[in-house]
Curated annotation (Swiss-Prot):
Keywords: Pyrimidine biosynthesis, Transferase. GO terms for molecular function: amino acid binding; aspartate carbamoyltransferase activity. Carbamoyl phosphate binds at residues 57-58, 107, 135, 138, 263-264. Its EC number is 2.1.3.2. Gene3D superfamilies: Aspartate/ornithine carbamoyltransferase (3.40.50.1370). This is Aspartate carbamoyltransferase catalytic subunit. It catalyses: carbamoyl phosphate + L-aspartate = N-carbamoyl-L-aspartate + phosphate + H(+).
Length: 319
């Protein structure tokens, strides 16, 4: 069962809803590997992608997902939109709502902006990342990648390493993996740990070698310099020496540990290129593949709920 009206974050989702979405995504993995990659799940529906921040993987993934489901997909060019002329987010939302879209996919630099927008529209809204808050589809695709690689999504030791403080990916993964009863570790310099991290029910390790010991999953995060307003690290060279993932540090993890990265990667900063390209350990390209399938599943489920809601309202009006 999946009851969500929007997909704004992982926090509101119950474990059975997460499992339902991942199970449906599995069917879309199979569809995406066929010669004809098409479904009519969103036939007759309109999807609008609004990205107030630059994106390659997420935006193209959502666009491809919508088209493979049969939706009419429109990408708004935010750099040339009325937002640049001073229009508020709410006015933009109201304008789009008047066009009767069915799904809005939104990325915004301000935490909470997508939640605000969702309150102003009648369609389903998917959060493609808002500030430091959440990135729900990234956590879901990571979960699917882990489940396929490890055969389960519970009782695993997961080390999330790097710039935790500025990462919405880390936050969403912590919530999701915590709901599924995993052992979680945050690894990185104290300057890149969020305040209150010790209250999140996970281990904190400033020493990367300690943090990686016996880990089943090693998730690397890039330095988000665009969200930094001060000197958080001495230098990239020093950072790589202490917290960059190389063969010597990875050897401390479980022998069958997988290596993940949400992208974009900074090779030689948070991860060595040979590790990123190691087909026996790295599942980074699998994450990209799972991203399309997970976004297809999310939009499919939200569309079903939207149709049911609209059908109930229509029946009520006719009664």
């Amino acid at each position: 069962m999946f009851r969500a009206r929007h997909l704004l974050g992982i926090e509101p989702l119950a474990p059975p809803e997460i499992t339902t979405l991942l199970d449906l995504a599995e069917t879309y993995v199979d569809l995406n590997r066929r010669t004809v990659k098409h479904s009519d799940a969103l036939a007759g529906m309109t999807q609008i992608n609004m990205f107030f921040e630059n994106s390659t993987r997420t935006q193209s993934s959502f666009e491809l997902a919508g088209k493979r489901l049969g939706a009419d997909v429109m990408n708004m060019a935010m750099q040339t939109s009325s937002v640049k002329k001073g229009e508020t987010l709410i006015d933009t939302a109201l304008t789009l709502n008047a066009m009767h879209p069915d799904l809005l996919v939104v990325r915004h630099p301000q935490s909470g902006a997508v939640d605000l927008l969702a309150q102003k529209v009648n369609c389903a809204v998917l959060n493609a990342g808002d500030g430091r808050h959440e990135h729900p589809t990234q956590a879901l695709l990571d979960a699917l990648t882990i489940r396929r690689a490890k055969g389960r999504l519970h009782r695993l030791t997961v080390a999330i390493c790097g710039d935790i403080a500025h990462s919405r990916v880390a936050r969403s993964n912590l919530i999701l993996l915590g709901k599924m009863e995993n052992r979680l570790r945050l690894v990185g310099p104290a300057t890149l740990m969020p305040s209150g991290a010790r209250d999140w029910g996970c281990e904190i390790h400033e020493d990367m070698r300690e943090g990686l010991k016996g880990a089943d999953v090693v998730m690397m995060l890039r330095l988000q310099k665009e969200r930094m307003d001060g000197g958080f690290i001495p230098s990239e060279r020093e950072y790589y020496h202490r917290w960059g993932l190389d063969a010597e540090k990875l050897a401390l993890a479980a022998p069958d540990a997988i290596v993940m990265h949400p992208g974009p990667m900074n090779r030689g900063v948070e991860i060595d290129g040979t590790i990123a390209d190691d087909i026996n350990r790295s599942v980074i390209q699998d994450q990209v593949e799972m991203g399309v399938a997970v976004r297809m599943a999310a939009m499919d489920l939200l569309a079903r709920n939207l149709r049911a809601e609209r059908g109930a309202k229509a029946a009520e009006m006719m009664a």
